[in-house]
């Protein structure tokens, strides 16, 4: 039912560093439209700092392959995944709000990936699904729910119906409009709080990066 998108984290060689090669960051789209994101470990750890859901999720998956050379360091990240996912809560909410706005703008936008849905429903059911799912995630995250729990929807049947395009265009427009309004209010209210990034997480990310890079070139 869902695409299987993959993240592939790469470690630069000594030659890459010595020759000042840019860190790898690219996406490969497979024939079945599934995506593989290739990203240098240095850049990937930066995505943790930016609190992007799409990149934080790998800390919570049960399906991964790890080079044994780096497993000890990776397991440190897994052990601290909740702390990492709450490293900078304001930025996390701002990032989720930004993603929500993008989904809202994409609802009726004519793009190659939307053509089939627009012809069928007049809107992208997939984008509406993402928007409503983000609203639920933000609601629970801003109320102190663990990241692991936030990832598990409490409205599976409804969201499945949305994703399958069971609702007409007028419903979709109203659902999207009211959702983005609620998200904006939640984000604004939360970001007024006095919350600082967690220094211990910053120290952990720096230490893991240092150790991985050291192992890679020695």
Question: Over which residues does each language-model region extend?
Answer:
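Conserved nucleotidyltransferase catalytic core and NTase-mimicking acidic/glycine-rich helix/loop elements
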Residues: 68-207
